[in-house]
């Protein structure tokens, strides 16, 4: 500051060339574009290796690969190796092994490392956010609106209760019991609403129960749960943007999200035939995929413009295009795009999570451990309660239905990722949500095997005896 005041004096500037004064003052080093690209490429190499190793290990023990991608991110992230760290977590260029490697193998100077580190973090974060947009588009594309509308009242009751009970229990418990601020408490409560249909469906198929009464109710409820969960996520993320948690604002956002989703679906029925016809007239490569992505990104932008979340627009686009004759073909073409971008999202969620805040040997970390334990209990009880909302059906295994709704899986990780990106969650709350997602995903398969003790063969024999 003193140097700047001296050099700005008219007397000094009359005798010293301005070019010398300009170089004399300390200027921040500029990041070289080629070095930023090199750091991003090295980050992607690290991300993809971690995602494949983690995914392969989990798939071999009958767990969802996305869980392995998350754990892979934790290993290479701030919690363990420090290969992939981000400025928003409080890390600097000195904490990044990738920056250290670049300084050893390129002409990256220590003075420019900070600028390259910041730029690298921004690029990877944007790719991560694009990955979750593609993921929600893919989920929408795989959803069946007709199936959603045909789901019976029993599945609907299970789904609605399975969203409300953990959301209210988690939010109220964190806010009143632990003194967590309102918006983080609401977001953590919202993360408890998710259900991973893929994990439960796989276990039910292995047990021969997928087509049982309980299996059909679980699958139907999980489909509704996905839609309700995404609406809840969009509303809560919008609350973070506005910073206003008044009842009137919540009602406005809920109505806006619902109206946007319904309006897009209704309007899409008129637009989709035009899009399909346009695709049929095109002769260039990628005509279907690019047209679909234009539609998805446009709706994602519109959702963002009206203070909702981009993922809601992408999900709505998937729902609309799922009703066209191009659905199967589009599903196949989206997979490679998802394979490139979605792992970036899941690995980054893990990499940004500091599990060190849950270290029990540090007294100040015990609050985070208690939060994690509380979220796990509410996550399990809230879904189990939902199974007992089916009345007048003593022949149905209600406990099995509730247990089938427990795993959070990739949907829970989407909540954690969006919460992390928003900056609304404290490190302990974010880590507690991640632990909740991991443990509910791990616990659900063995729990299902306990509440469904009979094998498929036993079930077939029982049905034969009833028939005779």
PLM-predicted stretches and their roles:
Residues 2-468:
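Transmembrane helical cores of multi-pass secondary ion antiporters/exchangers
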């Amino acid at each position: 500051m003193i140097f700047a005041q001296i050099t700005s004096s008219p007397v000094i500037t009359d005798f010293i060339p301005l070019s010398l004064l300009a170089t004399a003052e300390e200027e921040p080093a500029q990041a070289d574009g080629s070095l930023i690209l090199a750091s991003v490429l090295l980050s992607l190499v690290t991300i993809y290796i971690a995602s494949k190793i983690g995914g392969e290990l989990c798939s071999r023990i009958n767990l969802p690969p996305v869980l392995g991608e998350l754990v892979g991110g934790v290993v290479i992230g701030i919690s363990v190796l420090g290969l992939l760290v981000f400025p928003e977590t409080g890390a600097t260029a000195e904490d990044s092994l990738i920056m250290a490697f670049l300084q050893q193998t390129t002409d990256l100077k220590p003075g420019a490392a900070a600028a390259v580190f910041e730029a690298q973090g921004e690029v990877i974060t944007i790719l991560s956010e694009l990955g979750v947009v593609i993921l929600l588009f893919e989920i929408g594309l795989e959803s069946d609106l007709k199936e959603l509308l045909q789901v019976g009242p029993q599945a609907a009751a299970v789904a609605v209760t399975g969203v409300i009970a953990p959301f209210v229990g988690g939010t109220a418990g964190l806010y009143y019991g632990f003194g967590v601020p309102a918006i983080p408490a609401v977001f953590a409560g919202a993360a408890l609403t998710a259900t991973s249909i893929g994990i439960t469906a796989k276990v039910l198929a292995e047990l021969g129960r997928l087509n049982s009464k309980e299996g059909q109710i679980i699958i139907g409820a999980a489909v509704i749960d996905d839609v309700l969960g995404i609406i809840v996520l969009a509303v809560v993320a919008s609350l973070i943007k506005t910073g206003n948690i008044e009842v009137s604002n919540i009602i406005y956002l809920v109505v806006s999200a619902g109206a946007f989703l319904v309006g897009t679906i209704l309007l899409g029925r008129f637009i989709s035939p035009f899009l399909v016809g346009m695709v049929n007239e095109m002769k260039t490569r990628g005509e279907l995929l690019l047209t679909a992505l234009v539609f998805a990104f446009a709706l994602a932008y519109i959702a963002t413009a009206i203070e909702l979340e981009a993922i809601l627009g992408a999900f709505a686009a998937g729902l609309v295009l799922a009703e066209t004759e191009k659905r199967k073909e589009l599903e196949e073409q989206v997979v490679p795009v998802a394979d490139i971008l979605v792992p970036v999202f899941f690995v980054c969620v893990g990499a940004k999570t500091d599990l060190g805040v849950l270290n029990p040997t540090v007294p100040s970390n015990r609050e985070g451990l208690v939060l994690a334990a509380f979220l796990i209990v509410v996550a399990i009880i809230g879904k189990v309660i939902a199974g007992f909302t089916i009345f007048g059906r003593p022949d149905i295994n209600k406990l099995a239905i509730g247990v089938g709704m427990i795993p959070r899986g990739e949907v829970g990780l989407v909540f954690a990722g969006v919460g992390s990106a928003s900056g609304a969650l404290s490190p302990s709350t974010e880590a507690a949500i991640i632990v909740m997602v991991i443990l509910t995903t791990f616990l659900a398969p063995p729990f299902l095997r306990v509440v469904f003790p009979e094998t498929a063969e036993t079930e077939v024999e029982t049905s034969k005896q009833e028939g005779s």
